[in-house]
């Protein structure tokens, strides 16, 4: 059932949104979204809907982007293994994991400590190691040190 939902997400949501790069589609296949969501939302992991980020029963007032939007972002930034990325706004860590598959490193900036630790735990559980974490509003030292900048939160 989960594999069918993952397949449908890729074929019926992501591809129709003009995401066609094989390596991006493979990244979504190899990094299932459900593993990044709170248990209460895993049943909705592959639906084309924004989900609230609830951590330990507490609403963080953060909304997670849909898979098709995440795929569009990953394809658009077109990261290379020699490039570094900065991501402002962390969410559940799923976008970070996808970006990290393509980048030399990703530095994430998050204001909410519980979101940062939740995402960090998710990324560690999925063996994503090329991520640096900053508990701050982000980019206090400018953007020149990064090849790509992704604004994923506001």
Listing of model-derived features with the role each one plays in the protein:
Residues 74, 78-154:
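Conserved nucleotide-cofactor-binding alpha/beta core module
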Residues 21-22, 67, 113:
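Alpha-helix N-capping/helix-start residues
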Residues 1-45:
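N-terminal auxiliary segments of SAM/dcSAM-dependent transferases
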Residues 36, 40, 53-55, 99-100:
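Alpha-helix boundary/capping detector
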Residues 11, 45-55, 63-83:
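Conserved alpha-helix/loop element of class I SAM-dependent methyltransferases that forms part
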């Amino acid at each position: 059932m989960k594999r069918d939902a993952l397949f449908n997400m890729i074929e019926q949501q992501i591809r129709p949104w003009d995401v066609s790069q094989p390596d991006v589609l493979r990244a979504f296949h190899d990094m299932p979204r459900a593993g990044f969501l709170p248990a209460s939302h895993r049943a909705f992991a592959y639906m084309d809907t924004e989900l609230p980020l609830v951590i330990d029963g507490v609403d963080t007032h953060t909304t997670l982007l849909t898979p098709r939007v995440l795929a569009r972002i990953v394809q658009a930034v077109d990261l290379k293994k020699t490039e570094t990325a900065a991501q402002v706004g962390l969410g559940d860590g799923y976008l970070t994991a996808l970006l990290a598959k393509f980048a030399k490193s990703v530095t994430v900036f998050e204001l909410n400590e519980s979101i940062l630790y939740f995402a960090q735990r998710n990324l560690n559980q999925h063996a994503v190691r090329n991520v640096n974490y900053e508990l701050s509003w982000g980019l206090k030292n400018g953007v020149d040190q990064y090849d790509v900048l992704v604004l994923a939160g506001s």
